[in-house]
Curated annotation (Swiss-Prot):
UniProt biased composition (Low complexity): 137-147
Gene3D superfamilies cross-referenced by the UniProt entry: 3.30.70.60
Function (record text): Binds together with bS18 to 16S ribosomal RNA.
The name this protein goes by in its record: Small ribosomal subunit protein bS6
Keyword Coiled coil recorded: no
GO cellular component, one term: ribonucleoprotein complex
Biological process per Gene Ontology, one example term: translation
Pfam families linked to this entry: Ribosomal_S6 (PF01250)
Family to which the UniProt record says this protein belongs: Belongs to the bacterial ribosomal protein bS6 family.
GO molecular function, one term: rRNA binding
Alphabetized UniProt keyword annotations: Ribonucleoprotein, Ribosomal protein, RNA-binding, rRNA-binding
Length: 156
């Protein structure tokens, strides 16, 4: 992905990519012109270009070096789809999520019937504990400080 200024043309970006990758890139897609979260080069708008390519590591290193030199390319991001976890992952669609409640109701009787739960009886310890509620109060003591008047030189 390449981030360029709002006035930079698509042909400029494609010619730069052709000079580095020598027609190895599959496609260079211009994404929409967007407003940035913060200013880059005193502007709040930029263009994104998404580039898919297959090339060697030395060409990627050369691209990074030249994009740092070129003033028209503001930012760049290189992602290796083969080694990056989760980017080429094929998701399983046959997996069931959730429950089928119709099957569960048929096991408990007629459809739509539910059993009432019996109230749980409290043990003796639980019932005694709930009866005994002690109030907690924090004792506060006040200290009185008596200060002595300072002696002056005249009194000595």
């Amino acid at each position: 992905m390449v981030l360029v200024g709002p006035k930079t043309s698509a042909s400029t970006v494609e010619s730069f990519l052709k000079s580095v990758f020598h027609d190895d890139f599959k496609k260079a897609e211009k994404l929409e012109r967007t407003e940035l979260a913060y200013e880059i080069n005193k502007t709040k708008h930029a263009q994104y270009f998404l580039v898919n390519l297959e090339t060697e590591r030395k060409n990627i290193a050369e691209f990074i070096r030249l994009s740092n030199i070129n003033k028209e390319i503001w930012r760049h991001l290189v992602v290796n789809l083969d080694t990056e976890k989760g980017l080429n992952k094929v998701f399983k669609t046959h997996r069931k999520f959730g429950h089928d409640f119709r099957d569960q109701r048929s096991h408990h009787g007629q459809a739509g019937e539910f059993r009432k739960r019996e109230p749980q009886q409290k043990s003796k310890e639980q019932s005694e504990f709930s009866k005994e509620k002690k109030s907690f109060s924090k004792s506060v003591t006040k200290k009185t400080v008596v200060s002595k008047p300072k002696e002056t030189k005249e009194e000595k």
